[in-house]
Amino acid sequence: MPTLITGEKTPQQMKDMRECGRMLATIYDELRQRVTAGMSELDVNEFVAGRIRDFGAEATYLTDEVKFPGVICVSTNEQLVHSFPTDYVFEKGDVVSFDLVIGYHGMKTDSAFTMVVDEEPRGAKKHLLHATEQSLYAGIDAISGEGTRVGDISAAIEAVLKKAKLGIIRELVGHGVGLEMHQY
């Protein structure tokens, strides 16, 4: 269970969180451009490890107690989430999710994204990616400032996914930013 951490962040912590998020977004932008058929999951892991070092950050997946055998989760096709990077070589049309936690000056950012390798998504793949992206935006739109409850955000996300006839695996939801990966 994550540690309950309360209180305001200092201006420096806020700056470090933003910088950590910028690093994570940059790595994801680079992966969107770089991942192609013929590249392996281990190639991705090596690239991401190098970029994290370049930024002067650290890979902090999953927790300090769990020694994850890589710096990024790479879940391909039917794999659900949190898969270890392997020597699997991507093929055109693979649906791949990347999940990464970066630490920087004591702050952590945790995020994931999904893409289709070397093709424009069509059919079920397009439906999945579009619906999940729309659910993200619905969750963001549900944030109305101080006092917004996680349940309000979750309900907005769930409504979009239900309408799209997609389910939620309740034990595997959420990403975060703060002193811990899933700060509450």
Feature map (PLM): residue ranges:
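Active-site neighborhoods and metal-handling regions in enzymes and metal-associated proteins
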Residues: 1-184
